[in-house]
């Protein structure tokens, strides 16, 4: 395993640990998930470049699209919770039930 791959896997692991530690605030959780998605994107891009497989070149782009959708939905939920309750605690998520 090269040093670059090890650094990317370590960045993913640190983002996962950050998500587990700072899960009480929605903004912190969103930032950690974004770090996880970006490290997965870089790892998928490096893998596609190393494989020289034409169909594998679409995988990082698809992953980036899903990351953008996740970020947009998460930020919309953050704005809704912040405007309604004045805080971004994750405990307020079950208050949004119909």
From Swiss-Prot:
It is an enzyme of class 7 (translocase). The keyword Transmembrane applies. It is a multi-pass membrane protein. One of its GO terms (molecular function) is NADH dehydrogenase (ubiquinone) activity. Its EC number is 7.1.1.2. The keyword NAD applies. GO terms for cellular component: mitochondrial inner membrane; respiratory chain complex I. Coiled coil: none annotated. GO terms for biological process: ATP synthesis coupled electron transport. The chain crosses the membrane at residues 1-21, 29-49, 59-79. It is found in: Mitochondrion inner membrane. Keywords: Electron transport, Membrane, Mitochondrion, Mitochondrion inner membrane, NAD, Respiratory chain, Translocase, Transmembrane, Transmembrane helix, Transport, Ubiquinone. It holds the Pfam family Oxidored_q2. It catalyses: a ubiquinone + NADH + 5 H(+)(in) = a ubiquinol + NAD(+) + 4 H(+)(out). Its main location: mitochondrion. Belongs to the complex I subunit 4L family. Core subunit of the mitochondrial membrane respiratory chain NADH dehydrogenase (Complex I) which catalyzes electron transfer from NADH through the respiratory chain, using ubiquinone as an electron acceptor. Part of the enzyme membrane arm which is embedded in the lipid bilayer and involved in proton translocation. Core subunit of respiratory chain NADH dehydrogenase (Complex I) which is composed of 45 different subunits. This is NADH-ubiquinone oxidoreductase chain 4L. The gene is MT-ND4L.
